[in-house]
């Protein structure tokens, strides 16, 4: 990886956009070591999503930059993500879950006017049932979103915001400013 002083301006602008603060207090962002072999320049963030103090989802967002461009990317900057979340078992059985989970990403990007091209990815849903020495806890279900896309502008702030919106949807967080019924309400009993 090249030294920071030698970073191309397009990469530096994209990194600056990804260093914007998280739009929600439930989403904790942290810079992590980026993969070194995927592109000449790379930057990475990890995210932890908390609900009532418990981790309910997590992910990584990796920015790749190849000044020479990359034919498959349709550009010289690429964003790559992996997001995972534990689900309620009944949600994991929903046949529409993959399509809905994909729209969490595309809607999040659209909501923040994050223009892109060459988007692609996979949605994986798994259910685990424990047996033998591991028996006891109820079955668990997990969702995994792997995706990548090419921003059409160097400023990645809108892409960060769209990705955070997808994280919030994946984690089942209500929209900002909306409380779920039964939460944050005072009892009306004397």
Model-derived regions, located:
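A glycine-rich, hydrophobic loop/mini-helix early in the fold
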Residues: 44-84
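Short, internal acidic amphipathic alpha-helical interface segments
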Residues: 95-133
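Short, highly charged C-terminal tails/helix-capping segments
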Residues: 119-135, 177-190
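Short, extreme N-terminal leader segments that mark the start of a protein/domain
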Residues: 1-35
């Amino acid at each position: 990886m090249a030294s920071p002083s030698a970073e191309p301006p397009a990469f530096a602008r994209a990194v600056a956009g990804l260093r914007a603060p998280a739009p929600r207090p439930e989403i904790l962002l942290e810079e992590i070591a980026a993969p070194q072999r995927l592109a000449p320049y790379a930057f990475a963030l990890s995210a932890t999503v908390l609900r009532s103090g418990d981790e309910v989802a997590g992910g990584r967002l990796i920015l790749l930059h190849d000044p020479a461009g990359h034919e498959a990317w349709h550009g010289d900057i690429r964003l790559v993500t992996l997001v995972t979340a534990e689900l309620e078992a009944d949600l994991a059985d929903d046949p529409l879950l993959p399509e809905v989970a994909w729209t969490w990403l595309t809607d999040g990007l659209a909501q923040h006017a994050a223009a892109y091209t060459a988007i692609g990815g996979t949605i994986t849903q798994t259910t685990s049932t424990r047996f033998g020495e591991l028996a006891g806890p109820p079955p668990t279900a997990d969702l995994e979103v792997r995706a990548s896309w090419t921003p059409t502008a160097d400023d990645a702030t809108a892409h960060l915001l769209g990705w955070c919106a997808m994280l919030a949807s994946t984690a089942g967080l209500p929209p900002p400013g909306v409380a779920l019924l039964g939460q944050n309400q005072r009892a009306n009993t004397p």
